[in-house]
């Protein structure tokens, strides 16, 4: 997938104060700290909805990860951004709440680096998603124990931010 140069990320300091905007690719090329979010959706059985990233993703293609993740738009709340991407990637909307945030930095083989202040959002949904094949290759529901064990056994099949 081609990432438009117009797509902007919100640059932040380590306390999540906005300090500017930058093109998404440039921020990843220069490893500049920027705001992001990760959504974790559970069903009534306590299983986590995982997605396999589409083959066309510019980094981490075909790797398994949390339900969805992306970057907030300028002026968009964390909750609003999470619900927007749930709809765009997984084809459903549900209430989410923010649990915590953390900073991580992960370089990739393609010269890009994720350096994000990541807001973690949680929600609940019990139906099958209607995945957007441009964003998501596949999905599965797994218990947290099974996720933990599979990451230990197959770490290269999961995204850095999910491990």
Named regions from a protein language model:
Residues 39, 68, 98, 119-121:
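A structural signal for short, well-ordered beta-strand segments
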Residues 26-37, 47-84:
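Conserved Nudix-box catalytic region and its N-terminal flanking loop in Nudix hydrolases
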Residues 9, 47-48, 139-140:
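A residue-level structural signature of the nucleotidyltransferase/glycosyltransferase Rossmann-like core
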Residues 2-38, 44:
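Acidic, metal-coordinating catalytic segment for phosphate/diphosphate chemistry
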Residues 25, 62, 103-108, 112-163:
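Nudix hydrolase/Nudix homology domain
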Residues 89:
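Short alpha-helical functional segments enriched in proximate histidine and acidic residues
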Residues 92-101:
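A short coil-to-beta-strand element that immediately follows conserved catalytic motifs
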